[in-house]
């Protein structure tokens, strides 16, 4: 007796293909036809595995986060707050522009919701970005506690500054900015760091790019 329809596709590969569609077209712009064609499955299989288009997008975000975990771990492990900032912005600039054909330019967290009208999707993406900002804020709080950052520094504002700069890099990459352009912008943004926190210039410390 058959107990259920066997899954005849690789879930991870299907998610990677769906990720590219959402990345290029945004949540709202990605039709079910586009998604199922890219994933190599039919609509019943999509619904059976993910429940809905929104469920698929959530699964894609989880997979994207898995890719980013190594990158964020390396960023946060940098020995000083200045090097954390350096590793984060230069890493983002490299990731969103020099994809080697693996991904579209830009960032799924930004591009995925830019053209969407479904209010739940931008909120979902905002929560994911807030998690990254919280990681940076916590790291800077630790730096202030250890004396690496002055007591008068504002960890929340520093984390927010990096996130705003990173989001701008993502948008510019999607608009066609080159890797050189983005690294120059990152360098200018980082040149403000010493004045913001009262420390020396950040040393060069680049985290490994997320795959």
Residue ranges of predicted features:
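Short, basic, alpha-helical segments at the C-terminal edge of helix-turn-helix-like DNA-binding modules
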Residues: 62-68
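Amphipathic C-terminal alpha-helical segment
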Residues: 95-99, 142, 162-180, 192-202
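Hydrophobic alpha-helical connector segments
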Residues: 59, 73-105, 155-162, 203-204
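N-terminal intrinsically disordered/low-complexity leader segments
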Residues: 1-9, 199-211
